[in-house]
Curated annotation (Swiss-Prot):
The modification N6-acetyllysine is found at residue 68. This is Omega-amidase NIT2. It is found in: Cytoplasm. Belongs to the carbon-nitrogen hydrolase superfamily. NIT1/NIT2 family. It is an enzyme of class 3 (hydrolase). One of its GO terms (molecular function) is 2-oxoglutaramate amidase activity. Homodimer. The keyword Cytoplasm applies. Its EC number is 3.5.1.3. The gene is Nit2.
Length: 276
């Protein structure tokens, strides 16, 4: 199957977890009704984003939130990329994305590898590492359409991760993410287009909707970029479902026209994973 429909849910996240779960599942069902085959929720979709919130909202996996995601994936017969939630495991907290298949089974669990620790004087200072621990594994899953690679937000800044996913056969990279009003306008679209062109893959980002009253204000603008670096579709800042029909034939044509993946000089340089 050379084409499939991707849906990105730009959810308006509140401080009430049960409301977030109910709304997220409702929008997933709507996306499925509109023909989506793969659906992604945004980063931290079940709780406000912030180091003070992570411990209070953290759950085990499986747990309340992932059980709901499993059920709605099965009900809707879709592949569901569950954005991310704060996960508690063995006394540590992680920023974790769970993916469910059309039968409701857990396909893969991605823990954010690169923690968001930045300090831009006069603009924003944030340290996920105050409460979160980093993941230590690559995360891909297979579908009848293509192999998909996963990252969360800050992971997108690291070109090596995307390159390893491309080496492993991924044709779509999905990054649930919540850039802010400093990094968003500067780097959000730029990074997506760079990862797409560098690796000749589709890149999709699912952001929460913007809430100007939140302690951390998300940039919004969920986006899909094709392997040519063209923005196929981009949301504004409000809650919405973004749809894009992914054409893998176009990906193959681009790789044939500009065969950079075959032209890399392994005799001079390499990017390789140190773990499976």
């Amino acid at each position: 199957m050379s084409t499939f429909r991707l849906a990105l849910i730009q959810l308006q996240v509140s401080s009430i977890k049960s409301d977030n779960l109910t709304r997220a599942c409702s929008l997933v069902r709507e996306a499925a009704k509109q023909g989506a085959n793969i659906v992604s929720l945004p980063e931290c979709f079940n709780s406000p984003y912030g180091t003070t919130y992570f411990p209070d909202y953290a759950e085990k996996i499986p747990g309340e939130s992932t059980q709901k995601l499993s059920e709605v994936a099965k009900e809707s017969s879709i592949y569901l990329i569950g954005g991310s939630i704060p996960e508690e495991d063995a006394g540590k907290l992680y920023n974790t994305c769970s993916v469910f298949g059309p039968d409701g089974s857990l396909l893969v669990k991605h823990r954010k590898i690169h923690l968001f620790d930045i300090d831009v004087p006069g603009k924003i200072t944030f340290q996920e590492s105050k409460t979160l621990s980093p993941g230590d594994s690559f995360s891909t899953f297979d579908t009848p359409y293509c192999k998909v690679g996963l990252g969360i937000c800050y992971d997108m800044r690291f070109a090596e991760l995307a390159q390893i996913y491309a080496q492993r056969g991924c044709q779509l990279l999905v990054y649930p993410g919540a850039f802010n009003l400093t990094t968003g306008p500067a780097h959000w679209e730029l990074l997506q287009r760079a990862r797409a062109v560098d690796n000749q893959v589709y890149v999709a980002t699912a952001s929460p909707a913007r809430d100007d009253k939140a302690s951390y204000v998300a940039w919004g603008h969920s986006t899909v970029v094709d392997p040519w670096g063209q923005v196929l579709t981009k949301a504004g800042t409000e809650e919405t479902i973004l749809y894009s029909d992914i054409d893998l034939k176009k990906l193959a044509e681009i790789r044939q026209q500009i065969p950079i993946l075959k032209q890399k000089r392994a005799d001079l340089y390499t990017v390789e994973s140190k773990k499976p």
